[in-house]
UniProtKB/Swiss-Prot annotation:
It is an enzyme of class 1 (oxidoreductase). The gene is azoR7. GO terms for molecular function: electron transfer activity; FMN binding; oxidoreductase activity, acting on NAD(P)H as acceptor; oxidoreductase activity, acting on NAD(P)H, quinone or similar compound as acceptor. Keywords: Flavoprotein, FMN, NAD, Oxidoreductase. It holds the Pfam family Flavodoxin_2. Homodimer. Signal peptide: none annotated. Binds 1 FMN per subunit. Belongs to the azoreductase type 1 family. It comes from the Bacteria. This is FMN-dependent NADH:quinone oxidoreductase 7. FMN binds at S9, S15, V16, S17, M93, Y94, N95, F96, S137, R138, G139, G140. Its EC number is 1.6.5.-, 1.7.1.17. PANTHER family: FMN-DEPENDENT NADH-AZOREDUCTASE 1, FMN-DEPENDENT NADH:QUINONE OXIDOREDUCTASE.
Length: 201
């Protein structure tokens, strides 16, 4: 089994999503000691945002020297995603959405003819069979039923984007309200870690 571990938080040691994604990966390692883990830190090694040059290169246009390295990084990211049986993503909420570096990565793996295709009845995802676990952190409370639920363009987007690629086995390990005081923060993290441990059940 192969696991792709991605972090997108711009924070270091204080990142809740990084702490939780590491917990999730540790749970899968304990369950399968032979697990192969590939690590991708999108904050430390960002992928360039999609541009007209990237699209032209995908259609066979000559690649400039300035773009060549970034195209290779994007191709490697796609290959790592395709090879993974399990994908674990640390995804904090920034201004109601995901980190821009995570969006850049998603743009690079969303490739017509490779991870999805257009059929007679609309788009068809080609990545079914993968398991996705998202370690989600939020300063406020935006889960379903909360007054601020309409502001959630983080988990809702990720579910839609990966669903579009055919992934239906999606689990969110969520710690929210982490900016609303130390007690709520510690409680949210503890609850999320319990949910992560339950993945081994």
């Amino acid at each position: 089994m192969k696991l792709l571990h991605i972090d997108s938080s711009i924070l270091g040691q204080g990142s809740v999503s990084r702490e939780l994604s590491a917990e999730v990966v540790a749970t899968f390692r304990a369950r399968d000691p032979g697990l192969t883990v590939t690590r991708l830190d999108l904050a430390a090694t960002p992928i360039g945002h999609l541009s007209a040059e990237h699209l032209a290169a995908a259609q066979g246009a000559p690649i400039s020297d300035a773009l060549k390295a970034d195209v290779e990084i994007g191709q490697r990211a796609l290959a790592e995603f395709l090879a993974a049986d399990i994908v674990v993503i640390g995804a904090p909420m920034y201004n109601f959405g995901i980190a821009s570096q995570l969006k850049a990565w998603i743009d690079r793996i969303s490739v017509a003819g490779t991870t999805f295709r257009y059929g007679e009845n609309g788009p068809v995802g080609l990545c079914g069979g993968k398991k996705l676990v998202v370690a989600s952190s939020r300063g406020g409370v935006y889960s379903e039923g909360s007054p601020a639920a309409a502001f959630d363009h983080q988990e809702t987007y990720l579910k839609a984007a990966f669903g579009f690629l055919g992934i239906t086995d999606i689990t969110f390990i969520r710690a929210e309200g982490v900016a609303m005081g130390p007690d709520l923060r510690s409680g949210a993290i503890a609850s999320a870690k319990e949910a992560a441990a339950a993945l081994a059940a």
